[in-house]
Curated annotation (Swiss-Prot):
Name of the gene this protein is made from: recF
Molecular function, one GO term: single-stranded DNA binding
Residues that bind ATP: 30-37
Any GO CC annotation of this UniProt entry: cytoplasm
Role according to the record: The RecF protein is involved in DNA metabolism; it is required for DNA replication and normal SOS inducibility. RecF binds preferentially to single-stranded, linear DNA. It also seems to bind ATP.
Similarity comment: family membership: Belongs to the RecF family.
Main location group: cytoplasm
Native species: Synechococcus sp. (strain JA-2-3B'a(2-13)) (Cyanobacteria bacterium Yellowstone B-Prime)
Protein name listed in UniProt: DNA replication and repair protein RecF
Localisation: Cytoplasm
One GO process term, biological-process aspect: double-strand break repair
Keywords: ATP-binding, Cytoplasm, DNA damage, DNA repair, DNA replication, DNA-binding, Nucleotide-binding, SOS response
Domain of life per record: Bacteria
Length: 380
């Protein structure tokens, strides 16, 4: 796929900015807090409908404006599409594809596919389980747009069940009969999420292991293991088998759940274990090794999305390329070649391999405005 153009109105620190992408690689150069990451965030929103930096849409709207707009022209499999996302301070969104307003947000997913690699992604290695769950879910949203509805349904069930757990049994009346209902709902929806996560990781692991071997020169072996909070007998097991296991775990932890007033069983507590040579990756102190691992995960993600949708996704590199040594830069360049459109942000170009700068579109970013870079600008 190819992002032909992007138009940001009242988005973050962009008042009204259009950009046409005219090269496979676009490098955005500027000081911190000028808007480089904001531009990549807009593209990521088109791909996932989620921001990793904002909890509310209000944070995405420029100052006192009431709404922001992200418009893009995207070419997929040789066909151009016009996409529009409107974000309101109230939290209400509207989405359009080729001028048609969409009723469901899930129908927008898949219009843009993107893989993002930023400094935040080092949390995949050194952060808690939530970072790794969010990563898996983000990939699933792009591969299976219907997964969005499943996740939203699970969160709603979890809220209802937690509210019931917090109630005083004496005041809640038929609390326990209600709990049976929500237990069944949690098990049904949670099992569907678990099966999808397990199947995804089965497909990602060999790809990530391959890229990790390539980047590390064959010196290290990477393994990814899904550790669901509910023991999963087999990712291919029937939904009924998994649901029965789920309900058994709920019964085993019933007393603790009622005591704490919180659900202790379900995919909201899953873990993805990352190991290098059989040792938990977080035990490795080297930032170089951590970056190698995350780069392998991102290349696996990129390769899998390309296999499934039959079109290379966009690659968004936010202030990480210059931090990779020349070997890793070259491995990444070799992996994506010219077929993957790449948007890169950086504060300087001095540590870039010449292969990245060759024929790249270089833009200066200053105060929410973009300027074509003159020859030599920003290049020591």
């Amino acid at each position: 796929m190819y992002l032909r153009s992007l138009h940001l109105r009242h988005f973050r620190n962009y008042r009204d900015q259009e950009i046409t992408f005219d090269a496979p690689k676009t490098i955005l150069v500027g000081e911190n807090a000028q808007g480089k990451t904001n531009l990549l965030e807009a593209v990521e929103l088109l791909a996932t409908l989620r921001s990793r930096r904002a909890s509310r849409d209000r944070e995405l709207v420029y100052q006192e404006e009431r709404q922001a707009q992200i418009a893009a022209t995207v070419e997929r499999l040789g066909v151009a599409h016009e996409l529009v996302m409107e974000l309101r301070s109230s939290g209400r969104r509207s989405l359009k594809v080729d001028g048609q307003v969409l009723r469901r947000q899930a129908d927008f997913l898949g219009q843009v596919n993107a893989v993002v690699f930023s400094s935040l992604d080092l949390e995949l290695v050194r952060g808690g389980p939530e970072a790794r769950r969010n990563w898996l879910d983000g990939v699933l949203l792009q591969l299976e747009p219907a997964y969005l509805g499943l996740v939203e349904q699970y969160r709603q069930i979890l809220r209802q069940r937690n509210a019931l757990l917090k109630q005083d049994p004496a005041a809640a009346g038929d609390k326990f009969s209600q709990m049976d209902f929500w237990d069944a709902q949690l098990a049904t929806t949670g099992s569907r999420i678990m099966r999808r996560r397990a199947r995804l990781l089965q497909r990602l692991e060999p790809l990530a292991a391959h890229w990790h071997r390539v980047i590390s020169g064959g010196r290290e072996t990477l393994t990814l293991t899904y550790r669901p909070q509910v023991p999963l007998p087999d990712p291919q097991a029937s939904p009924e088998v998994i649901q029965a296991q789920f309900l058994a775990e709920i019964r085993a932890k019933a007393a603790a759940e009622h005591s704490l007033g919180s659900s202790l069983v379900g995919p909201h507590r899953d873990e993805v274990e990352l190991c290098i040579n059989g040792v938990a990756a977080r035990a490795y102190g080297s930032q170089g090794q951590q970056r190698t691992l995350v780069l392998a995960l991102k290349l696996a993600e990129l390769e899998l999305i390309e296999q499934v949708v039959r079109d290379p996704p966009l690659l968004l590199l936010d202030d990480v390329l210059a931090e990779l040594d020349l070997h890793r830069q070259n491995q990444l360049l070799e992996a994506i070649q010219e077929r993957v459109q790449t948007l890169v942000t950086t504060t300087h170009l001095g540590s870039f391999d010449a292969g990245w700068l060759k024929a790249a579109q270089i833009l200066q970013v200053q105060g929410g405005q973009l300027f074509p870079s003159k020859t030599g600008d920003g290049i020591p």
